């Protein structure tokens, strides 16, 4: 509860008459005065900011006459105006039937003492104090400090003490007569725990919201209006409604006729026809039927889907390393093919005189460099021209034949045979070395005859 006021009091000040107790059926009760929270600040426009007989005189002057009373509520922190009629005929004591005390309402809610645990057979239990819901708000004397209550209890040892107690459960104040006794058999003179401070103040508006709540049990003859969201119509029991035909159920059943999930789905249609429009629940037998559904082709029953083949045959293990014509192999490089050169035939190994035959494996053939297309016009004669001059060569025909034979074999291994190769070799050899014309020609002819 806040201790500061939110409105300005007419005439200024923070003083008034604190309403402590309101008797039943009294003029103050009919005016709506609320104990502990209400402060009478003025009557008929007269500000009550002093502790004198002004309030009594105004009430006596207006007996059986309605007067206007301005009330400040520390619960709502607002001012309100009410009408009260002082009377001696209502059947109780006083003209208003209320107990009041002049004090300041600024900080009045801070001086409260919260009743905590209450021991059995203690003076507090015998006086009717209720644990955790009772708040001691005052006594016959003014208490402004926390020690004022304990001092008052010590001075009333074994003597009756009147306390004003507010209860949050009943939202009302009452007078409690308690007799402090330190020899009651327990701790303390009251036998109860008392809290003081910020954490033990009276909660703000404890029952204002709760009073507006009306339970359905209090209105036995009033039928409960169903909600418009449809949730009140959902029945959680297994008993079906007597006869309900919601319009949305028929459309759902018609739209589901074209959807063939299994051969006979009777369980689904029975659930949709129960009449429950919002929460259709599937019974357990649906799951049993779904477990026995044979494999089917969804393209035959569901429209708008791409048709799938009826079944896939058992495929053997495929060799994933087979290169497709449109897929470049991921590992390795493709073979370099020169479009201007025909493929080279495999040559048999040469048996040279005096040298052991050297086998030429086929796996070493791709390691030889290929002659580019620009040098394809070069003949074997150019390769022979790089040999040493024939003037320095020995005159032995067999040696000349062997060299020519070796040169001819080198030329055949590197460059493909062409039609112009023999003529070019004969012309170049004839121009440079006329002495070895016949042996070279014979060697070339021999090679040509030996080639496959």
Curated annotation (Swiss-Prot):
Changing residue 441 to D: Phosphomimetic mutant. No loss of its ability to mediate unconventional (ER/Golgi-independent) trafficking of CFTR to the cell membrane. Disrupts homodimerization. No loss of ER stress-induced relocalization from Golgi to ER. The gene is GORASP2. A lipid is attached at residue 2 (N-myristoyl glycine). The modification Phosphothreonine is found at residues 222, 225, 415, 433. Residues 372-424 have a biased composition (Low complexity). Residues 194-199 are annotated as: Important for membrane binding. Key structural protein of the Golgi apparatus. The membrane cisternae of the Golgi apparatus adhere to each other to form stacks, which are aligned side by side to form the Golgi ribbon. Acting in concert with GORASP1/GRASP65, is required for the formation and maintenance of the Golgi ribbon, and may be dispensable for the formation of stacks. However, other studies suggest that GORASP2 plays a role in the assembly and membrane stacking of the Golgi cisternae, and in the process by which Golgi stacks reform after breakdown during mitosis and meiosis. Changing residue 148 to N: Enhances homodimerization. Loss of ER stress-induced relocalization from Golgi to ER. Changing residue 449 to D: Phosphomimetic mutant. No disruption of homodimerization. It comes from Homo sapiens (Human). One of its GO terms (biological process) is spermatogenesis. Changing residue 100 to S: Abolishes organelle clustering. Keywords: Differentiation, Endoplasmic reticulum, Golgi apparatus, Lipoprotein, Membrane, Methylation, Myristate, Palmitate, Phosphoprotein, Repeat, Spermatogenesis. Residues 15-105, 111-199 form the PDZ GRASP-type domain. One of its GO terms (cellular component) is endoplasmic reticulum membrane. It is a lipid-anchor. PROSITE patterns: PDZ_GRASP. InterPro entries: GRASP55_65, GRASP_PDZ, PDZ_sf. Homodimer. Homooligomer. ER stress induces phosphorylation-dependent monomerization. Interacts with BLZF1/Golgin 45. Identified in a complex with RAB2 and GORASP2. Interacts with JAM2 and JAM3. Interacts with members of the p24 cargo receptors. Interacts with CNIH1 and the cytoplasmic domain of transmembrane TGFA, prior its transit in the trans-Golgi. Interacts with KCTD5. Interacts with TMED2 and TMED3. Interacts with SEC16A in response to ER stress. Interacts (via PDZ GRASP-type 1 domain) with core-glycosylated CFTR in response to ER stress. The modification Phosphoserine is found at residues 214, 409, 436, 441, 449, 451. Residues 372-452 are annotated as: Disordered. This is Golgi reassembly-stacking protein 2. It is found in: Golgi apparatus membrane; Endoplasmic reticulum membrane; Golgi apparatus. Changing residue 59 to A: Abolishes organelle clustering. Its main location: Golgi. Pfam families: GRASP55_65. Myristoylated. Myristoylation is essential for the Golgi targeting.
């Amino acid at each position: 509860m806040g201790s500061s006021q939110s409105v300005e009091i007419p005439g200024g000040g923070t003083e008034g008459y604190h309403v402590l107790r309101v008797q039943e059926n009294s003029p103050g009760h009919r005016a709506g005065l609320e104990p502990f929270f209400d402060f009478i600040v003025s009557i008929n426009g007269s500000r009550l900011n002093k502790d004198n007989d002004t309030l009594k005189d105004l009430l006596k002057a207006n007996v059986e006459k309605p007067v206007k009373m301005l009330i400040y509520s520390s619960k709502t922190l607002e001012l309100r105006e009410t009408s009260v009629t002082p009377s001696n005929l209502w059947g109780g004591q006083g003209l208003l039937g209320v107990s009041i005390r002049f004090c300041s309402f600024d900080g009045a809610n801070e001086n409260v003492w919260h009743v905590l645990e209450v021991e059995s057979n203690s003076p507090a239990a015998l006086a009717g104090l209720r644990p955790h819901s009772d708040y001691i708000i005052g006594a016959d004397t003014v208490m402004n400090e926390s020690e004022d209550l304990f001092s008052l209890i010590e001075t009333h040892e074994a003597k009756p003490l009147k306390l004003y107690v507010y209860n949050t459960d009943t939202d009302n104040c009452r007078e409690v007569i308690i007799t402090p006794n330190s020899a009651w058999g327990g701790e303390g003179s009251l036998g109860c725990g008392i809290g003081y401070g910020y954490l033990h103040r009276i909660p703000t508006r404890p029952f204002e919201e709760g009073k507006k709540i009306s339970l359905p049990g209090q209105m036995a003859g009033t039928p409960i209006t169903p909600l418009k969201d449809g949730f009140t119509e959902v029945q959680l029991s297994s008993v079906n409604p007597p006869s309900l035909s919601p319009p949305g159920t028929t459309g759902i059943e018609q739209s589901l006729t074209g959807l063939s999930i299994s051969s006979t789905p009777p369980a689904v249609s029975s659930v949709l026809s129960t009449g429950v429009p919002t929460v259709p629940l599937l019974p357990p037998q649906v799951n049993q039927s779904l477990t026995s559904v044979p494999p089917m082709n969804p393209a035959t029953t569901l429209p708008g889907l791409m048709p799938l083949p009826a079944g896939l045959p058992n495929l053997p293990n495929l060799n994933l390393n087979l290169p497709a014509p449109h897929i470049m192999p991921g590992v390795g490089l493709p073979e370099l093919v020169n479009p201007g050169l025909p493929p080279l035939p495999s040559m048999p190994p040469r048996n040279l005189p005096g040298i052991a035959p050297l086998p030429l494996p086929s796996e070493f053939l791709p390691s030889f460099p290929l002659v580019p297309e620009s040098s394809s016009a070069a003949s074997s004669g150019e390769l022979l021209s790089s040999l040493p001059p024939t003037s320095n060569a020995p005159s032995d025909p067999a040696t000349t034949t062997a060299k020519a034979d070796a040169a001819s074999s080198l030329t055949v291994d590197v460059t493909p045979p062409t039609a112009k190769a023999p003529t070019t070799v004969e012309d170049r050899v004839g121009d440079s070395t006329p002495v070895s014309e016949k042996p070279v020609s014979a060697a070339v002819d021999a090679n040509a005859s030996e080639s496959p």
